[in-house]
Amino acid sequence: MDSGIGLLAAAAAVRRLRPDADLVLSSDPDGMPWGPRTPEDLTGRALAVARAAAEHRPDALIVACNTATVHALDAVRAELEPDIPVIGTVPAIKPAAASGGRVAIWATPATTGSPYQRGLIRDFATGARVTEVPCPGPVSYTAQRCG
C-alpha cells in the first residue's frame, strides 16, 4: 500500500522474489501525496487503505511508503496483526551510514525530522554526518506526471 505509484517498486521487488504470489495493490490516489499531511490525517488515510487491502485477505501487507511507515505503522499493525503481518519500509539509513562519511536523506517533509527517522539516525548513523533534506516537490511532480 502507498498513496500512489510508489507501491509499484515494492510490488516489482515482491514479484521478483515470489513470482507465484498474487498481489493486491491498494492506494489512495485521491489523497496523494501523503507527505504534506499531518500525522493524524496520514494515519487515518493509511488505515483506510490498509482496511481496503485487508478485505482481500492477503498473506501480508507491505506499507511501501516511508511517510506512512514512520507515522502509521503502529496503528496499522494494531488493527491487522496477528491475522495479517504488516511490513513497513523506512529510509535505508543503516546501510547508507555504515561506511561513515556524509549521508543525505531525501524524504517528504513528514518523514524528515520525524521522531522515527531521528531514532534511526541516532541508532544507526553514529559515525556518519547526516543531512536531512525535506523535499515535497519530487513526489508531487512524479504523481502528477505518472499517476
Walk through the language-model features, giving the residues of each.
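Non-catalytic structural scaffold of enzyme domains
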Residues: 1-147
